[in-house]
């Protein structure tokens, strides 16, 4: 997605692809058509695509449904989350980290709810669940780039939830869309690992753009398989479409995706990206600056 600046515009999708892929292009490029044809097949067959990544825990769609119920209580939310013991353990470990700074150790979900509130617990729950999906990869290439992909996903989700109210979108749906939008890219990396020799990742501009587009459609299809709200899949499928830049959730997700990619690219100090950060409008710069606060908290946690 281009970002407005002096000519020529920056294409952050393409720049991020090259930044992600560059260290892993070590040999002759493999067959681009082979990869793109397989991704096109997975776009048409989201059920098969969804088997290439761990499934989102069943509690996530349940939590989403409870959001639409006026009768849903904190106790209902705690009961839903308690169905997944592994998820509960990860949530409690996370909520006791320096990032959240609890005054006393939190030992159960009720304590986490008191500290975070319902919306805060929902977001933490989603973050823990999707981190497992993106980070626990066995294929070589997906495993190597998963830390960067998770970093971008987490930042995109954070920004999308902050931008959602400005666009009339639901903050939690925006947060989930940010976490979900790179899942198709994980699938694409697994496809590349299965079809091409090590080091054979193609890195042409044309391939990068087509891969990113196909991966988004795969993400959207998997979101449907996982029973996430249709608005999430729609927003992901239309990321970067000019016709949706001013419409609710797609607009919030599009801006968030750009900000998250820009933050990671600007971290390398390249003048073009640093200048793009300096040119951000005030409202977007405020959201961008929250990434630094989160990174600082994560370093303290480490």
Predicted regions and their residues:
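Catalytic or ion-translocation cores adjacent to nucleophile or general acid/base/metal-coordination motifs
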Residues: 198
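Conserved alpha-helical "signature site"
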Residues: 1-194, 202-302
């Amino acid at each position: 997605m281009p970002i407005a600046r002096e000519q020529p515009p920056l294409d952050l999708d393409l720049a991020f692809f090259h930044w992600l892929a560059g260290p892993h292009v070590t040999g002759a490029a493999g067959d681009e058509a082979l990869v793109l044809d397989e991704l096109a097949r997975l776009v048409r067959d989201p059920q098969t695509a969804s088997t290439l990544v761990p499934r989102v825990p069943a509690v996530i769609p349940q939590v989403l449904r409870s959001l639409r119920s006026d009768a849903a209580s904190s106790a209902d939310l705690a009961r839903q989350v308690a169905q997944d013991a592994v998820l509960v353990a990860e949530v409690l470990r996370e909520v006791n980290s320096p990032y959240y700074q609890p005054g006393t150790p939190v030992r159960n979900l009720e304590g986490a709810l008191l500290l975070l509130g319902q919306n805060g617990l929902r977001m933490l729950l989603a973050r823990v669940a999707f981190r497992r999906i993106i980070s626990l990869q066995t294929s070589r290439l997906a495993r190597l780039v998963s830390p960067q992909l998770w970093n971008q996903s987490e930042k995109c989700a954070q920004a999308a939830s902050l931008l959602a109210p400005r666009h009339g979108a639901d903050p939690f749906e925006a947060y989930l869309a940010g976490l979900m939008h790179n899942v198709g890219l994980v699938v694409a990396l697994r496809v590349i690992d299965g079809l091409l020799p090590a080091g054979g990742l193609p890195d042409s501009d044309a391939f990068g753009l087509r891969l990113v587009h196909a991966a988004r459609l795969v993400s959207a299809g998997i979101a449907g398989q996982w029973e996430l709200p249709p608005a999430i899949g729609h927003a992901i499928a239309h990321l970067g479409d000019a016709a949706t830049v001013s419409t609710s959730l797609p607009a919030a997700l599009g801006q968030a995706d750009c900000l998250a990619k820009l933050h990671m690219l600007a971290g390398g100090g390249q003048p073009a990206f640093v200048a793009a950060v300096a040119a951000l409008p005030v409202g977007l710069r405020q959201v961008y600056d929250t990434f630094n606060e989160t990174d600082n908290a994560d370093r303290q946690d480490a």
